[in-house]
Amino acid sequence: MDLFEYQARDMFEAHGVPVLAGIVAYTPEEAKAAAEKIGGVTVVKAQVKVGGRGKAGGVKVAKSADEALEHSTNILGMDIKGHTVNKVMIAQGADIAEEYYFSVLLDRANRNYLAMCSVEGGMEIEQLAVERPEALAKIAIDPAVGIDQAKADEIVAAAGFAEELRGKVADVILKLWDVFKKEDATLVEVNPLVKTGAGDIVALDGKVSLDENAEFRHAKHAQLEDKDAADPLEAKAKAQDLNYVKLDGEVGIIGNGAGLVMSTLDVVAYAGENHGNVKPANFLDIGGGASAEVMAAGLDVILGDEQVKSVFVNVFGGITACDAVAKGIVGALAELGHTANKPLVVRLDGNNVEEGRRILNEANHPLVTLAATMDEGADKAAELANAAK
C-alpha cells in the first residue's frame, strides 16, 4: 500500500525523523487556515500517489495565507497523470541549502534490502541513475542485521557526504531504517533530504510503501488506506478476499494459483497478437477453493469491468477437483443471471477433469465454450474479445 506524502510525513515524525510542519486540507478554506496556523512562507502540495506533481503545477509556494487559498483553489480537482487531486498538504517553507537523496527498499531480485543514497537529490532518481550512475551509492543491506551505526556510516561515506555532515545524515538514516523495519515497509524514500540554512538535516518529501501481507501486525495501517483513491473493482475484490489486479486489456482472466494465472496472462497476450492485439484485463487468482460462491464473486468483479469483452477461466484441478470447479461455474452463472452476459472460455485439466467437462457439457450454457488446452482457450478468448470490440 502506497501512502500519501502527508501520511509518510506523519509516520516519519512518529519515528523521530526530522520533518517540517505539514497540515492536510480538503478545501481552499482549510488550506488558508492551515497556512495561517503554520505562518510564514508555505508550500501547497497536491496529494496524489504519482510523481511529476511539480511539473504538472501541483506544487506552489505561497507567501501568504491568501496565496495558499488561491493556489489550493487551482490545485484541488486538478488531474495529474490520471489522478484527481482531492486534498493538498500545506507544508512549512524551507530554507534549503543543499538537497540529497536516500531510500531503502526491498530488493526482490537479490533477496535482501538495498539502500541508495546521493548528495545530488531533488531530481528524478531514475534520470540520475542513468546519466550519472557513479553519483548514486547502492549498498546491500543484510536483512538479519539491517542498518546499524556502522552501516549508516558506510552509506554516507559511499555517497560522498562532507565529513562534517556524515554524523547528522547517518542519524537520520538510522531513523528512516526504523520506519522501514517497524512499519513493515517495502520502500522508504526521501527526495529531497535537505540541509537547511541553519545546518539541520530535514526530510522534505517522503514516499512510503507498506507490505500489505504484514497488515495483521499493524491494525492502524487499515486507517491509512484511501478508499476514494482505490480502483472500485480492486476494492470490491478485496472486500471479497480475492487476489485481483486490474489491467488494461479486454480478456478477463480467472485461474487457481498465482503461477498459473501469470502464465495465462502471457499466453493470452501472445494469442491477442493475432486477434486485434487484445490483452489480459486482469489478474484474478481464486486460490484452492472454486466453490460457486468464489467463482460467482470472481465473475461478478470481472464482468463489472466495462473493458472486458470475454472471460478465460483456466483451472488445473488439484486439491479442488475439476468437477467441483465445473459445479462452481454452473452455479455462478445461475447466481449471476442476466449480469453474466459475456462469453466464457473454460479450460479444465487435472484431477477429475472428465467429470468436470461432462458437467459443463450437460449444462450447455450458451455463454460457455470448452477448450482442451490453455493455448486453445487463450486463442478462443482473444478471438471472442476482438469480435466484441
Curated annotation (Swiss-Prot):
The keyword Magnesium applies. It catalyses: succinate + ATP + CoA = succinyl-CoA + ADP + phosphate; GTP + succinate + CoA = succinyl-CoA + GDP + phosphate. Its cofactor is Mg(2+). One of its GO terms (biological process) is succinyl-CoA metabolic process. One of its GO terms (cellular component) is succinate-CoA ligase complex. Mg(2+) binds at N191, D205. ATP binds at K45, G52, R53, G54, A94, E99. Keywords: ATP-binding, Ligase, Magnesium, Metal-binding, Nucleotide-binding, Tricarboxylic acid cycle. GO terms for molecular function: ATP binding; magnesium ion binding; succinate-CoA ligase (ADP-forming) activity; succinate-CoA ligase (GDP-forming) activity. It is an enzyme of class 6 (ligase). Its EC number is 6.2.1.5. Pathway: Carbohydrate metabolism; tricarboxylic acid cycle; succinate from succinyl-CoA (ligase route): step 1/1. Coiled coil: none annotated. Gene3D superfamilies: ATP-grasp fold, A domain, ATP-grasp fold, B domain, Succinyl-CoA synthetase domains. Belongs to the succinate/malate CoA ligase beta subunit family. Succinyl-CoA synthetase functions in the citric acid cycle (TCA), coupling the hydrolysis of succinyl-CoA to the synthesis of either ATP or GTP and thus represents the only step of substrate-level phosphorylation in the TCA. The beta subunit provides nucleotide specificity of the enzyme and binds the substrate succinate, while the binding sites for coenzyme A and phosphate are found in the alpha subunit. This is Succinate--CoA ligase [ADP-forming] subunit beta. It comes from Pseudarthrobacter chlorophenolicus (strain ATCC 700700 / DSM 12829 / CIP 107037 / JCM 12360 / KCTC 9906 / NCIMB 13794 / A6). The lineage of its organism: Bacteria, Bacillati, Actinomycetota, Actinomycetes, Micrococcales.
